Amino acid sequence: MSGNTFDFVVIGAGCFGAWTAHELLRGGHKVLLLDAFGPAHSRASSGGESRVIRMGYGRDELYTRWSLRSLAAWKALAQRTGRTLFHQTGMLWLTGAEDSYARKVRQTLEYLGIENESLSARDLEIRFPQISAEGIEWALWEPGSGALMARQSVQALVADGLRQALHGGCEDCSIATPIP
């Protein structure tokens, strides 16, 4: 790598760093992605087996929109790479009578047209008989949410970015582990 120049250096090959480098590469830039331990290593927050992707973030429409966009990007990556990166398991919010946050989540999901369903305590026990509704006022079901296979996803993303860079003629684009 000595003597190479890059348009951008991205520090950290976790979820945010990997996506940043990936999008810069797609934009035709020469990118160096640095991480002390490599993409999605066990010390990184993106290095675990799974992370929840959900749409509900209270009244925060911006974060909810970002979550939708993020999920679409992960699904597109899975399609390109032929790997199973996301498991659509749904997200179930269990709420008490005083839970204003869940009500805000529901309002935001409704406003943005995101599929969701409110369940009474009785409906909850019928739909999910393994859950006791004792102390639960109502539940909110987000069927489109689920689990992202975090480590595999970030590693697939970095590999996909490098593939795209090489096909675009960027032989110098790389991932490096700094030498102490």
Regions found by a protein language model. Name each.
Residues 50-127, 136-137:
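Dinucleotide-binding Rossmann-like beta1-alpha1 core, especially the glycine-rich loop
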Residues 2-16, 32:
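Beta1/beta-strand and adjacent pyrophosphate-binding region of the FAD-binding site
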Residues 12, 35, 95:
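Short beta-strand/turn micro-motifs composed of small residues
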Residues 25-46:
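Glycine-rich FAD pyrophosphate-binding loop
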Residues 43-50, 131:
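Short, flexible, mixed-charge acidic loops at enzyme active sites
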